[in-house]
Amino acid sequence: MRSAVALCLLLFNYAVHSHEQTPTYPTWKVSGISEIKKTQIRLWNSRPDIEYYEIGVFDGDWQPIPFVTAYKIIPVKYLQEVKVDIYIRESNIEEARYVCSLSKLRSSNESQTLLVTRICSKFK
């Protein structure tokens, strides 16, 4: 029995890498523009095979909410941290529940991962 468990552990010993997103519970703050609120998230890329991440803001039913960032697809190099400012209209604040980052795969002929990761933070 022990040898079977050891064999399974050896065969299925894969390292899974993901990216990180903080804060876990972001809050909206005054942006300096009337009727616009702002929040900031930080992305940390711990995946050597991924270089781009897409940002999205969603309501409780996972429907997209309009928002503005400098870029919707953000380049983040391996082991690099990037801060992203997200702006939204005050009229959409009540609807917005989640801000998510989604890893984007590059289309190339090289061998690549098929694992896409999405990390979401919930607004307080």
Question: Language-model features: where?
Answer:
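Positively charged n-region of N-terminal signal peptides that target proteins for export
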Residues: 1-4
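Beta-sheet-dominated interaction scaffolds and their linkers
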Residues: 17-42
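Exposed beta-strand and adjacent loop surfaces of beta-rich binding modules
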Residues: 38, 50-54, 96
